[in-house]
């Protein structure tokens, strides 16, 4: 009897152990299955993520490619516009730039540059504000800082001509002397841009095209320039930054006072090495012009 009871007890223990082992096996199998499923899902999600990232990279690369194509197309257009003579229609638009067109527009222009101290700051700000300007460059400074001239062109600004020396007695010695000053600077610009076909065809007379001691010489020079297909451009608003103003607030007020209620405004400023106040004022000027509803343009906007 005792042996029977003992055997039954052992059998019971065996059954219990078997049940426990079975439970453990089922549990392990379940855990393994869950982990396998989780691992499979992780791999699936990882693959999906990689595919999504690859698609994003592909789209970004395509977007970048399209932007580069658009940028190159713009550069090619600017090269074409500056590799030929102005049409009669383009000359008329420049000649009558101050004429109202039914909308408010403003041309920011900078003389006497480039300079290594002020011009880069102005270019950085214009790029940030997405504003294109017109730079009337001095030949001597073009030779000194060709990379800045190249940057001006590459970033969509119009590179125009302000003569080579800015010495009135030299520039206005004769009409031929004025033309020589123009040509010397054109050669410097072409060299800076690495483009032998570049022609700005646009000159700003040092001191303006009218008045002063050299007025008669200016008129004679103007006629010779026009005979050679070269237009000139003055201004109808200015910051007076060349007059020694001491604060950026004074510069801004000068622009406001001289532009008045004009619809088409050409603002004279300078980017020579001592005109840091012009840069410091520029952000406020851009904000003011936008508040007044002006659209920013440069000479390219007058060309076909």
Residue ranges with predicted function:
Residues 77-177, 181-191, 196-201:
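Active-site beta->alpha N-cap acidic-glycine motif
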Residues 3, 9, 33, 102, ...:
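Residue-identity detector for glycine
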Residues 166-268, 272-290, 294-295, 301-304:
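Catalytic domains of cell-wall/extracellular-matrix polysaccharide-remodeling enzymes
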Residues 57, 63, 68, 74-78, ...:
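Generic hydrophobic/packing signal
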């Amino acid at each position: 009897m005792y042996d029977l009871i003992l055997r039954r007890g052992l059998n019971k223990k065996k059954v219990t152990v078997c049940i426990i082992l079975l439970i453990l096996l089922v549990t392990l199998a379940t855990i393994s299955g869950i982990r396998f499923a989780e691992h499979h899902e992780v791999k699936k999600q990882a693959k999906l993520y990689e595919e999504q990232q690859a698609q994003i990279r592909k789209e970004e690369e395509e977007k970048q490619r399209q932007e580069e194509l658009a940028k190159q197309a713009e550069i090619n257009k600017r090269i074409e516009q500056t590799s030929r003579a102005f049409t009669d229609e383009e000359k008329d638009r420049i000649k009558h730039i101050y004429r109202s067109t039914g909308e408010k527009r403003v041309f920011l222009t900078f003389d006497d540059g480039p300079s290594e101290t002020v011009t880069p700051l102005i270019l950085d700000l214009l790029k940030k504000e997405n504003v294109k300007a017109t730079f009337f460059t001095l030949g001597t400074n073009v030779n000194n800082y060709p990379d800045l001239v190249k940057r001006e062109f590459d970033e969509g600004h119009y590179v125009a001509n302000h003569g080579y020396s800015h010495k009135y007695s030299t520039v206005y010695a004769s009409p031929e002397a004025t033309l020589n000053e123009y040509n010397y600077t054109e050669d410097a610009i072409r060299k800076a841009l690495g483009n032998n076909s570049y022609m700005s065809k646009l000159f700003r007379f040092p001191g303006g095209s009218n008045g002063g001691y050299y007025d008669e010489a200016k008129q004679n020079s103007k006629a010779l320039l026009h005979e050679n297909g070269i237009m000139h451009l003055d201004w109808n608003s200015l910051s007076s930054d060349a007059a020694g103003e001491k604060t950026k607030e004074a510069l801004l007020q000068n622009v406001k006072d001289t532009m008045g209620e004009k619809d088409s405004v050409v603002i004279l400023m300078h980017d020579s090495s001592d005109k840091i106040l012009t840069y410091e004022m520029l952000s406020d000027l851009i904000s003011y012009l936008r508040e007044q509803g002006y659209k920013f343009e440069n000479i390219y906007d007058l060309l076909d």
